[in-house]
């Protein structure tokens, strides 16, 4: 039986729809009354593991799931050994540096050396500022990173931005993008290499169901 790690939250509905195109019905995970974390398909060919977004690469890299759907931002942050198979196009957002609108900063290089930068994505932030050759003190936060500049704890933040509404409502502005992120179909490398057909057929069907240029 093929095991697929699906992230709870914003990516779940589109993930289920994409697997449906491959003949796998995971719609039971969308039932608001569902409390099961391991949900088989009616056909018995596969089962879904409902996990946190950040845990998808872990389940896939350790082989507890042969396939998974996760945001590119998570892959960049955790850097676990998984095979990136298909850019699914949905869940589009960008990783950005943001500051208070009144700060006067217009690009990341304007930030003072050794200033504090708050983020949930400290690995991504570290790589970015290292590439700029700008030493900063990274402050790891698990939520509401916008409060960093508002309270004066940090000069800037690095966070995911979709519409930018949260930034605007808190007096912040994005000044530079690190990268664009979309949902990715990932696989356990050894399982993909040793596959004798079942995994490839699912991956091919999902790839065929992904419209070119429809990324959002």
From Swiss-Prot:
Superkingdom in the source lineage: Bacteria
Record-level GO BP terms: L-histidine biosynthetic process
Keyword Disulfide bond: no
Catalytic reactions of this protein: 1-(5-phospho-beta-D-ribosyl)-ATP + diphosphate = 5-phospho-alpha-D-ribose 1-diphosphate + ATP
Subcellular location: Cytoplasm
Entry keywords, A to Z: Amino-acid biosynthesis, ATP-binding, Cytoplasm, Glycosyltransferase, Histidine biosynthesis, Nucleotide-binding, Transferase
Pathway(s) annotated for this protein in UniProt: Amino-acid biosynthesis; L-histidine biosynthesis; L-histidine from 5-phospho-alpha-D-ribose 1-diphosphate: step 1/9
CDD domains from the UniProt entry: PBP2_HisGs
GO cellular component: cytoplasm
Molecular function, one GO term: ATP binding
EC number: 2.4.2.17
Assembly: Heteromultimer composed of HisG and HisZ subunits.
Family of the protein in this entry: Belongs to the ATP phosphoribosyltransferase family. Short subfamily.
Domain comment as written in the entry: Lacks the C-terminal regulatory region which is replaced by HisZ.
Role description: Catalyzes the condensation of ATP and 5-phosphoribose 1-diphosphate to form N'-(5'-phosphoribosyl)-ATP (PR-ATP). Has a crucial role in the pathway because the rate of histidine biosynthesis seems to be controlled primarily by regulation of HisG enzymatic activity.
Protein known as: ATP phosphoribosyltransferase
Organism: Synechococcus sp. (strain CC9605)
Name of the encoding gene: hisG
